[in-house]
Each structure stands twice: as C-alpha cells, then as structure tokens.
Amino acid sequence: LMIIEDDVRRTRRLGWIAVGISTAITSFWAFWGIIENFHEGWYSESLWANLGMLLLQYLAPMLIFMGLALVSIIWPRAGGVTHGLLALLAVWFFRAFSVTATFLIVLPLLGLGVLHYLGRPQPRRTAIVVVLGVPLLTLVIAGIGPALRVSQRVDNGSFGMRYVEGNGVALYWAPAGPGWPVVGGDWFAAQEACHFLREDGLTLAAVQPRIWRLPTVEEAVRSMARHGQNSGGEWDEESASAIYDRTPDKEPPLWNVHSPVIYWWTATEIDDGQAYIIVYDGKVWPRSKELGPDNLGFRCVKEIEAPN
C-alpha cells in the first residue's frame, strides 16, 4: 500500500513539475508574442489582417505550447509522445544536432515529454486552469501598454516630401518612392538609391546627382518625434546611445504607420562592415551593412533652405 501511495505522490509531483515548466514556457511565448506584435506588427489598415497576423505569427508559439500542455494533462501518454515527435521534427528542421538547437529545443522537448508521460497532476482541473490562466494573464498584462500606444498613433496619410525642422536639424525627407521604399534592403543599396535620386525625390536618374543622402545617426535621433512634437533626442557618440525627452513612435512626419518597416539605415558607419540603424522608438543599433530584411528600410534626406 505504501509503495502504491509513493507511486501516486511521485506521479503527481512529476505531473506538476511538467505543468510548471509548460506554463513557464507558454507564458514566455505569450509575453514575447504580444510585445513583438505591437512592436513590429499591427501595421495593416485591416483589423482582420492584424488579428490574423497576431494569431498565426506572433501568438502561434504560445498556442502550440498551450495546446501541448492541455493534451498532456488530459491524455498524458499521448502528450508525452507528441513532445517526442516534435523533438524529432526539430532535429529534421535544423538538419543537424547543432548545439543551440539541441540545448534550447530538442532536449527540453524530450525532457518535458518524459515528465508529461510519467506524471499525473492532480487535481487535473486545477492544472488546466494554471496552464490556461497564467499565460493569458501574462498576455493581457504585457499587452495593455503597447496596445494603448499603438491605438493612439497619429496618422495624417501624407507620404509626400516633408520639411522637418527642430532640435538643431533642418532637412527635407524624401517622399514615398525609391527614396522611401515600402520594403527594406542592405546599406549599400540604400546609399545608392539616395545618390541616384532626382531633385523631386520621385524617380532615379541615370547619373548620380548626389542631391540626396542617408541621414546621419545624429540627424535621425534629433529628428524623431511623437504626436507631431519633436522628441528632444540627443546622440551620445561616446556611449553610442540616444537619449530622448519623450519616447518617439512610428508616426508622421517621418514614419508610415501602415508600413512593415520599423528600422532605418543611417549614413553613420562604425567600420567597413557595420553601420548604425535607428528604430522608430528611437533606439540605435549597429548592424552589418549586408543585412537587408524587409523591415529594415531607409528614407533619404537633403539639405535645402527652408521654404519661405
């Protein structure tokens, strides 16, 4: 009888360890997903497109791990086997037992599968509430602030050439087109596009007029704004960091609210292989000049006297 009771306690303990780990992993992906959704996603003019991106892209890891945990609580053996199959799928996906994939994905999935296979958390209803409730609570708490910020963005729908003056900088910013594209590219392509841009900023010339250029990192930092007001940014070259009176956002006159681009190249080089990029919220990071994802774009600038 004592052996049976010990076995029951052991299976309960293993079950709750599995529930705790699954809940922690699911909560992490809930936090990451909702933060990233409102940082780089939620840019479409269609609510349904935004919701679809939220569920299928940013919350997919959370939903997968939550589903795995629920299956494992209700059908422990099936859940344990499913974890093992996913570990094998991860091995196939990464094509080899790389150190990163092994320690961060494969081994955790296998270990969690064994715990769920052997464990029996009781009461089961409480385990289900924990697996569902904690990640969803994390999602809501982490998402309130970013959701409010995005909902309060100002959008005047103007994508023409803009003259922006303030905080010691006065520049014309290129209109939508080759000098302000909707998708990104590498630093070299951005430099070339600016150099070939004609006076009106709408077309490229056959020979480089060199009227336009990329903004320096200091110019970009000093030009950042929120709700139509300059953010009072200053660039500290010694620490390679930007400081603002108020956090900038993805808004006019510089940014397109409905564009997937959230980073811009600057003209400021770190060395032959790296240059600074600026995020719409004002952060500045070094990046390889050969990097060219769709969300890393640019906007050319030119120096001309302010219109009368």
Predicted stretch roles:
Residues 25-32, 84-96, 137-144:
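Aromatic-anchored segments of alpha-helical transmembrane domains
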Residues 61-70, 103-116:
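Hydrophobic cores of alpha-helical transmembrane segments in multi-pass inner/ER membrane proteins
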Residues 69-82, 119-125:
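Membrane-helix interface "capping/anchor" motifs
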Residues 78-90, 129-133:
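Central hydrophobic cores of alpha-helical transmembrane segments
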Residues 123-150:
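Internal/C-terminal transmembrane anchor helices
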Residues 148-212:
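Extracellular adhesion/carbohydrate-recognition regions
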Residues 195, 199-210, 217-276:
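An exposed tryptophan-centered "aromatic clamp" motif
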Residues 263-265, 286-308:
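Short, structured beta-strand segments at or near domain termini in extracellular proteins/domains
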